[in-house]
């Protein structure tokens, strides 16, 4: 229920004003990634008039959480029902929603270069989507959001690529400070986080949302609309 409310809020926030929708959802499609050397699965939401119009649409990249996949927002979060309702109530514009699978990559480039997921996302996935579907390619028509691991990924991408997104909605984002990360690398997620971030702290610093924000000149913060939702017990 909490995830459904989150999604309704971000759809209304990211692209407000608009039309009616009786949409189509395709689950577990895929494209070949040269950077990863494997297929990348994704699910996609197409608005009601996609097949009868020639217009291009704004896009929301919606990222899943840890242990989830490209189908979870649809099967567990009722994404289609919520998006249809928001559009029908004119609280969101007709849009395309892309939900890629990220496995347990945390949406970053692995420190040793073996799994450059972030590079794949921006250099292959986004261009593929814009070539395959009628998606607007300007910043003001592209938003990103995610839950937990996906909240971290959406937050990180908005900071690493501020020229790419007009809005970002990290939901219960799994954002850690140095102390928590060191503890996780030593104990609870030892194999995973050491594989992703490496034995030192340099790669972690480059992908630490809190450090990036603290190092940023306040006058140069990205011009992105943020909707940040975090509960008292998140963390």
Where are these regions (language model features)?
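Bacterial N-terminal signal peptides that target proteins for export
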Residues: 1-9
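Bacterial N-terminal signal peptides
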Residues: 8-16
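Non-catalytic cap/lid and distal C-terminal segments of serine-dependent acyl enzymes
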Residues: 22-235
């Amino acid at each position: 229920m909490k995830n459904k409310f989150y999604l309704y809020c971000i759809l209304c926030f990211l692209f407000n004003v608009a039309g009616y929708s009786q949409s189509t959802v395709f689950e577990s499609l895929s494209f070949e990634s040269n950077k990863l050397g494997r297929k990348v699965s994704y699910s996609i939401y197409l608005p009601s008039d996609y097949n009868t119009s020639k217009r291009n649409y704004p896009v929301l990249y919606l990222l899943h959480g840890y242990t989830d996949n490209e189908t979870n927002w649809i099967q567990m979060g009722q994404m289609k029902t919520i998006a249809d309702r928001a559009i029908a109530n004119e609280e969101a514009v007709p849009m395309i929603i892309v939900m890629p699978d990220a496995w347990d990559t945390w949406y970053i480039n692995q420190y040793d270069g073996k799994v450059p997921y972030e590079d794949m996302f921006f250099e292959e996935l986004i261009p593929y989507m814009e070539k395959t579907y009628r998606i607007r390619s300007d910043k003001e028509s592209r938003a990103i959001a995610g839950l937990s691991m996906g909240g971290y990924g959406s937050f990180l991408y908005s900071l690493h690529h501020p020229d790419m997104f007009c809005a970002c909605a990290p939901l219960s984002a799994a954002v850690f400070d140095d102390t928590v990360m060191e503890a996780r690398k030593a104990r609870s997620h030892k194999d995973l986080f050491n594989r992703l971030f490496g034995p030192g702290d340099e790669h972690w610093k480059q992908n630490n949302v809190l450090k990036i924000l603290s190092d940023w000149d306040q006058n140069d913060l990205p011009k992105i609309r943020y909707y940040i939702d975090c509960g008292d017990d998140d963390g």
